[in-house]
């Protein structure tokens, strides 16, 4: 496990209560490890962090996308708070190096498990919120999610719907998605998906079928336009 100093530097925030940070990075497998001196894991913080993230992302969108209607804002929010986006944020923070887990969980591929990274990211958001206030948490989320706010059109936020609309507008059958390959351990698999519209095909990979489908749809749309 790494020292927390680098993580706090990336966050731009230093915890006053380090036990909150430790709790946010403690995997549930530790419940079975009686020698671990902290009796809490990140699940409760994850629950709170999910709500805090949704609230603050909604507020950021409401203020920054003044000309967007509710339906479009909902699509963008769905993209910003989905598992894949949260995992990217957690990966850039290198959370896999900081999550505290049992040896058994680590051997089973726990450090590269997207679910663990997503859960720890949400728990970390809750820990920041409890250790500081809503304004500081807002600023940190705005910074961590900044690159995802730069997308210029809804195609990038909801590529599957956009591809379906393109197919209908051009009198083609609806897109067909097919799982081509699954590699890796059970809880850290990499999925390869193919999407086909008429004679056009695109293959992409992701940590979930849903992520791979979105990537494939987005890539195919960029080729078609």
UniProtKB/Swiss-Prot annotation:
The keyword Coiled coil appears for this protein: no
Family as reported in the entry's similarity comment: Belongs to the ribonuclease III family.
SUPFAM superfamilies linked: dsRNA-binding domain-like (SSF54768), RNase III domain-like (SSF69065)
Keywords: Cytoplasm, Endonuclease, Hydrolase, Magnesium, Metal-binding, mRNA processing, Nuclease, RNA-binding, rRNA processing, rRNA-binding, tRNA processing
The encoding gene: rnc
Record GO biological process: mRNA processing; regulation of gene expression; rRNA processing; tRNA processing
SMART domains: DSRM, RIBOc
Cofactor: Mg(2+)
Assembly behavior: Homodimer.
Domain DRBM: 158-225
Entry's Gene Ontology cellular component terms: cytoplasm
Active site as annotated: 50, 122
Superkingdom classification of source: Bacteria
EC number: 3.1.26.3
Physiological role: Digests double-stranded RNA. Involved in the processing of primary rRNA transcript to yield the immediate precursors to the large and small rRNAs (23S and 16S). Processes some mRNAs, and tRNAs when they are encoded in the rRNA operon. Processes pre-crRNA and tracrRNA of type II CRISPR loci if present in the organism.
Residue ranges of every copy of the RNase III domain listed in the record: 4-133
Protein name, UniProt field: Ribonuclease 3
